[in-house]
Amino acid sequence: MNDVKSCLLVGVGGQGAILISKIMSNGFMKAGYDVKQSEVHGMAQRGGSVSTQVRWGKKVYGPVFGKGEADIMVALEKMEAVRYAEFLNPNGVAVINDYAIKSTTIASGAEAYPEGCIEAMQKNFKTIAVPASDIAIELGNPKCMNVVLFGAMCDSLGCPEIDWEQVVAETVPAKVKELNIRAFRAGREAAQKCR
């Protein structure tokens, strides 16, 4: 791969977007790619938006990219997909967790949660929507939702030479390694059903 590829990961604080970016970066580095990563935490500790950008290729000169430049966008919450859609290029792939987190204003009834987030993305982009949060709960730990979603997106990375399951096993803490391997496999399987 000579050209640079870019992935935008978006979610709400505490959902694990940064862990996904670390898994990606570790895998690409092991495969010999030049990798750059950036993180924006915002008000993450208060349920605010979190985004991280990962770029990989033969030579990457900077970690940040602009609107319309992401080849892949991973949204750990479906409203975040719509919020950051302008960063995805027209031929890009959106991988979305079909899950809603209600902000304080929505939970209080002051605002309504927007309808049709996934449908809006499907009109404009190739979209893989999986119930990653539900799958994680079925696996016994809702915190592994991020790895479920990573599994759903890994085939879109276009790097079949990388053993992503092994990278997950090497990146996550040992005490949750088996859970995260199951989460990765479940996410990959869910995405294959969407294709």
Regions found by a protein language model. Name each.
Residues 1-195:
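Active-site cofactor/cluster-binding pocket
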